[in-house]
């Protein structure tokens, strides 16, 4: 998809949502716990055709890539995460077919989804099988005729299924004799039923329901890929891509909240001046969250470009993007409630709804804790495989960036990456990863360090005018450089403080004395100079004050 087509798609989406989903309507849907099925179906209709975005051009779709999907998902989340989840369910439900189906299956089902605007549901999760899909209990028993398998009988229960009560098609993961396998099930199949909608904390404009399958028969040509036992492999093929979508949801929700807090603070007078002019307000409740969101954006965009360049599934990168962006979005929404004070706690002012909605992004498509485990498990293997050089080499690459552009905080990121490499080596030598909590905390530090590297690279590209032509351009190159410097400093302090906290207490006394030197503590302390000035500058940018 070219830039012009993406821009037209985003413009059409904004026109549609402003007409059909004004703020009053969104609050009504939230209050009544109503899934706006007509609106969601119309989004798949001729006027907008949002489902065409992810369908390949050869099957009469728009052939959008990961970058296009990220931009659209962020825009959807800015409007309403519940409705966005209904759209995501069709994207997600189609993925096993797109990435694992036979050509004939892709042609048949993708064409139907595009032309008929079918809603889909992704039927993987079960009461006893959430992130651990290997524990699923739904079974698919072969039906044999004349010695050949002609179909399957599927029996089991699925839970937390988005669009579960309204989908036209379900992609269902079930255990066949050769292992977990995806099957395509139509809504009118005998034995298929759904429960009442879940009464949820947030995303109340989405439909989430249990789905039950009791001896549901499907023909053998509904087995995705035409071969049993490929289900978990096919699911793994799309995690990098689908987690990028949820990362974009966190980004959109977080900025939607901050973009309500920022104008509120310009008109709210306290102590004779607007809140927007008080560092105690902006430097706690606004700036840190804007910075973290933009770090998430940098990692999303870098990963999306790599997926579109067919570098591979990038599951770990998808996990980092999701972790950084959804935690940042959830934090920004929470801070926005505080930023509005008592008004923020009331439904009328919207930010409390955004907070309730944003919370799910840290849970669905893999909890933040699963992301921490996934991130550390993969990068730990790279640390071992490279004999400890993986992050030292990444630091050297970033230090080269510092020589090219000394304004984006790349030298600070270099300290972060060298320190991270030392932490991982200490953990190896002292066998600290036998403590699961240490493993998870390392996953967090890895995500922040790689996010800092990605943001520095994005700021440097912006300075050279080399951002992706489809990239979001809210901030000038100068503002991005300041944002990158802030995030690099914050990450450096996080690695030092968290590393000292968790490693220092477990290291032998003989090794504890040089911990500060190995983590580059003196250098990192010196990099904190200028932090307040950079935060002041970013505040001026966000509040559109003179930055000359």
Where are these regions (language model features)?
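Amphipathic, small/basic residue-rich leader segments at the start of a protein or domain
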Residues: 1-87, 107-108, 112-115, 147-148, ...
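Glycine-rich beta->alpha junctions and the first turn(s) of the following alpha-helix
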Residues: 4, 8-9, 78, 194-294, ...
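C-terminal helix-coil-helix/basic helical segment that borders enzyme active sites and/or dimer interfaces
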Residues: 25-31, 265-273, 293-324, 337-340, ...
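Internal helix-loop-helix
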Residues: 46-107, 111-117, 163-169, 293, ...
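Glycine-rich phosphate/cofactor-binding loops in nucleotide/flavin-utilizing enzymes
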Residues: 72, 343-409, 503-548
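A short, Trp-centered hydrophobic/proline-enriched beta-strand micro-motif
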Residues: 116-124
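C-terminal amphipathic alpha-helical interaction region
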Residues: 409-548
């Amino acid at each position: 998809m070219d830039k012009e087509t993406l821009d037209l798609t985003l413009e059409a989406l904004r026109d549609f949502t402003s007409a059909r989903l004004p703020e009053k309507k969104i609050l009504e849907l939230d209050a009544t716990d109503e899934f706006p099925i007509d609106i969601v179906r119309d989004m798949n209709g001729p006027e907008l055709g949002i489902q065409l975005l992810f369908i390949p051009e050869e099957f009469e779709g728009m052939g959008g890539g990961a970058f296009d999907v990220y931009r659209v998902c962020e825009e959807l989340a800015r409007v309403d995460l519940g409705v966005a989840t209904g759209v995501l369910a069709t994207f997600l439900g189609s993925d096993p077919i797109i990435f694992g189906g036979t050509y004939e299956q892709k042609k048949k089902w993708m064409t139907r989804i595009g032309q008929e605007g079918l809603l889909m549901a992704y039927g993987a999760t079960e009461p006893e099988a959430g992130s651990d899909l290997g524990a699923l209990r739904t079974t698919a028993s072969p039906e044999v005729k004349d010695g050949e398998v002609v179909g399957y009988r599927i029996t089991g229960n699925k839970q937390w299924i988005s669009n579960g009560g309204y989908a036209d098609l379900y992609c269902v993961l079930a255990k066949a004799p050769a292992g977990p396998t995806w099957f395509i099930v139509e809504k009118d199949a005998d034995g298929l039923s759904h429960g009442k909608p879940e009464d949820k904390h947030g995303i109340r404009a989405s439909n989430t329901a249990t789905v039950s399958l009791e001896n549901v028969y499907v023909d053998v040509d509904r087995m995705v890929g035409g071969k049993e036992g490929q289900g978990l492999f096919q699911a793994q093929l799309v995690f990098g891509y689908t987690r990028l979508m949820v990362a974009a949801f966190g980004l959109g929700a977080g900025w939607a909240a901050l973009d309500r807090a920022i104008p509120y603070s310009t008109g709210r007078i306290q102590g004779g001046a607007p809140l927007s002019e008080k560092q105690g307000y902006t430097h706690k409740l606004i700036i840190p969250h804007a910075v973290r969101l933009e770090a998430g954006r940098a990692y999303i965009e870098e990963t999306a470009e790599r997926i579109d360049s067919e570098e591979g599934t990038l599951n770990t990168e998808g996990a980092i993007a999701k972790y950084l962006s959804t935690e940042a979005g959830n934090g920004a929404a929470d801070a926005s409630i505080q930023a509005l004070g008592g008004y923020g706690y009331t439904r009328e002012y919207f930010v409390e709804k955004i907070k309730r909605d944003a919370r799910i992004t840290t849970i669905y498509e893999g909890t933040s804790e699963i992301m921490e485990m996934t991130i550390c498990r993969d990068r730990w293997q790279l640390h071992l495989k490279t004999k400890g050089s993986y992050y030292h080499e990444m630091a050297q690459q970033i230090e080269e960036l510092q020589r090219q552009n000394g304004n984006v905080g790349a030298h600070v990121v270099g300290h972060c990456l060298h320190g991270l490499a030392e932490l991982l080596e200490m953990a190896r030598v002292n066998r600290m990863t036998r403590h699961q909590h240490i493993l998870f905390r390392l996953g967090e530090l890895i995500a922040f360090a790689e996010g800092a590297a990605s943001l520095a690279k994005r700021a440097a590209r912006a300075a050279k005018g080399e951002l992706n032509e489809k990239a979001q351009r809210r901030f000038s190159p100068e503002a991005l450089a300041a944002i990158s410097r802030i995030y690099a400093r914050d990450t450096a302090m996080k690695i030092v403080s968290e590393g000292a906290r968790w490693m220092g207490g477990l290291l032998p006394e003989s090794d504890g004395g040089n911990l500060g030197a190995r983590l580059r503590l003196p250098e990192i302390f010196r990099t904190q100079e200028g932090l307040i000035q950079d935060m002041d500058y970013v505040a001026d940018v966000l509040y559109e004050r003179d930055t000359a």
